[in-house]
From Swiss-Prot:
InterPro entries: HTH_17
Gene Ontology MF terms in the entry: DNA binding
Keyword vocabulary terms for this entry: DNA recombination, DNA-binding, Viral genome excision
Name of the encoding gene: xis
GO BP terms: DNA recombination; provirus excision
The UniProt record lists the keyword DNA-binding: yes
Source organism of this protein record: Shigella phage SfV
Pfam family, one: HTH_17
Identification of the protein by name: Excisionase
Function statement: Excisionase and integrase are necessary for the excision of prophage from the host genome by site-specific recombination.
Length: 147
């Protein structure tokens, strides 16, 4: 039974194709599926390791959300579509040496690609990290401009 007819109005809205939100269609016309893959399932699907998947999520290559966004240890959830997008992601990823032998992939998304729920400016974060990195490794950093 619907209280005050509110829900049935929403149902009617969901049935109208011109209202993109209720049909889960993004501005770019992609159909968004509900978050349905666990991190392990995504790893199987992508044929990558768990640490790689987490790195992809942190660097913005793989879109994911936490099951409970309020808990930092909550398990990640993603979609097949996000996994496919991560695989098709242009491979102009920059190798950034972290100074202690760890090399991480960092990729900057253009603002046109930022989907709902992504960190506001991933590129700005990377720039901040890179400038911190430069301070840390000043003196032993090789300048690629000089031979």
């Amino acid at each position: 039974m619907h209280g005050m007819g509110y829900d049935s109005r929403l149902d009617r809205l969901a049935a109208t194709s011109w209202y993109p939100f209720f049909n889960n269609v993004t501005a770019r016309g992609e159909i968004m599926e509900p978050y349905s893959l666990t991190l392990d399932e995504a790893c199987d699907f992508l044929k990558i390791s768990r640490p790689t998947a987490i790195n992809w999520i942190r660097t913005g290559r793989l879109q994911a959300t936490r099951k409970d966004p309020t808990k930092s240890k909550s398990p990640y959830l993603t979609t097949r579509q996000a996994c496919i997008a991560a695989l098709q992601s242009p491979l102009h990823t920059v190798q950034v040496s972290a100074g202690d032998g760890i090399t991480e992939e960092r990729k900057c998304h253009s603002s046109a690609e930022v989907k709902y729920g992504t960190p506001v400016s991933h590129c700005r974060t990377v720039k901040d990290l890179n400038s911190l990195l430069e301070q840390r490794t000043k003196g032993r950093r090789q300048n690629s401009m000089t031979s």
